[in-house]
């Protein structure tokens, strides 16, 4: 029996395939997952809107593996989304790499997205 914060079997299986430089996409319901996630394994967690939150998923994943880099999508108007401070709190030793919308989509389509 797992005694870690993260116990979801599909996520644990996907993380077991990761190595240095692998990427994991954590997205909310607004992300065009079917079109912009390439061959990555998809794990659907939505129970109802906002549950679980992206930050909750990040915390659970971070509890079982090291995170080397964090890439986030720039907003259309260039403002910083309210969620960025939550990411920075969970990943205090990392700078958030801000990518434009289509650059972010391209990054999510890469072969190293698990």
Question: What residue ranges belong to the model's regions?
Answer:
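A short linear-motif detector with a strong N-terminal bias
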Residues: 2-5, 22-23, 49-51, 92-96, ...
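Structural motif
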Residues: 22-25, 40-43, 68-72, 94-97, ...
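A phosphate-binding glycine/aspartate-rich beta-alpha loop in the early core of alpha/beta enzymes
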Residues: 36-72
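Flexible, glycine/proline-enriched loop segments at strand-loop-helix junctions
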Residues: 1-2, 45, 70-77, 100-102
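Long, hydrophobic N-terminal alpha-helical segment
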Residues: 1-47
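Long, charged alpha-helical interface segments
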Residues: 75-114
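Electropositive phosphate-/nucleotide-binding environments in soluble metabolic enzymes
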Residues: 5, 9, 48-55, 77, ...
């Amino acid at each position: 029996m797992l005694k870690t914060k993260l116990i979801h079997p599909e996520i644990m299986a996907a993380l077991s395939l990761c190595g240095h430089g692998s990427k994991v996409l954590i997205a909310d319901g607004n992300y065009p997952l079917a079109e912009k996630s390439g061959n990555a394994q998809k794990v659907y967690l939505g129970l109802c809107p906002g549950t679980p939150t992206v930050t909750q998923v990040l915390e659970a994943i971070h509890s079982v593996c090291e995170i080397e880099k964090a890439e986030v999508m720039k907003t259309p108007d260039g403002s910083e989304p309210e969620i960025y401070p939550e990411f920075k709190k969970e990943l205090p030793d990392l700078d958030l790499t801000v990518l434009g919308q289509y650059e972010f989509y391209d990054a999510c389509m890469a072969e190293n997205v698990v």
